Curated annotation (Swiss-Prot):
It comes from Rattus norvegicus (Rat). Part of the tectonic-like complex (also named B9 complex). It is found in: Cell projection, Cilium membrane. Keywords: Cell membrane, Cell projection, Cilium, Cilium biogenesis/degradation, Glycoprotein, Membrane, Transmembrane, Transmembrane helix. The gene is Tmem17. GO terms for cellular component: ciliary membrane; ciliary transition zone; membrane; MKS complex. GO terms for biological process: cilium assembly; non-motile cilium assembly; smoothened signaling pathway. The chain crosses the membrane at residues 47-67, 78-98, 110-130, 142-162. Its main location: membrane. This is Transmembrane protein 17.
Amino acid sequence: MELPDPVRQRLSNLSLTMFGDSSRTGPESSEAADNEMVSSLPLQMSLYFNSYFFPLWWVSCIVMLHLKYSVLPDYYKFIVITVVILITLIEAIRLYLGCMGNLQEKVPELAGFWLLSLLLQLPLLLFLLLNEGLKNLPLEKAIHSIFTVFLTFQVISAFLTLKKMVNQLAARFHLQDFDQLSASSATGRRARQSSEEL
């Protein structure tokens, strides 16, 4: 299951714009850019542990919500249930995109993971952690804090990994462009030499 082409293209363009190294004018090396793995082991380990921590977080959240449900005002009941449902849906998509983007070195998937983490998941989780009106219990503060640490680490490491991936893809593109240019100039020289011989 892959991202639709228009979404992939827009995420690729966004990634190139945000994470590309505009100061570089050419590839750094010819051989290293082709074979270097730029997947992030710390990011993958964090995603792995997060996939085991998330069910624990979800069960704890539901149990704590059940315990304090009668004390919460009606509007907070609706908000908390909506936020927990959103976090659950986003987390499934986010973990999938993070694993696929990191392991297969796909920039659009990893950029989607980074954007979901930074723009949706982190603000929702900070709302649950820092809102005083929710009357957070100590267990909730602990699990939300751990989840926030996971997310913060993943946002930072995904940013650094995306930067490396985009720079490597740019180097590959420049190498291919250089190879095509040198091949076409060699063909042009051969054509000129054969026409001169005639």
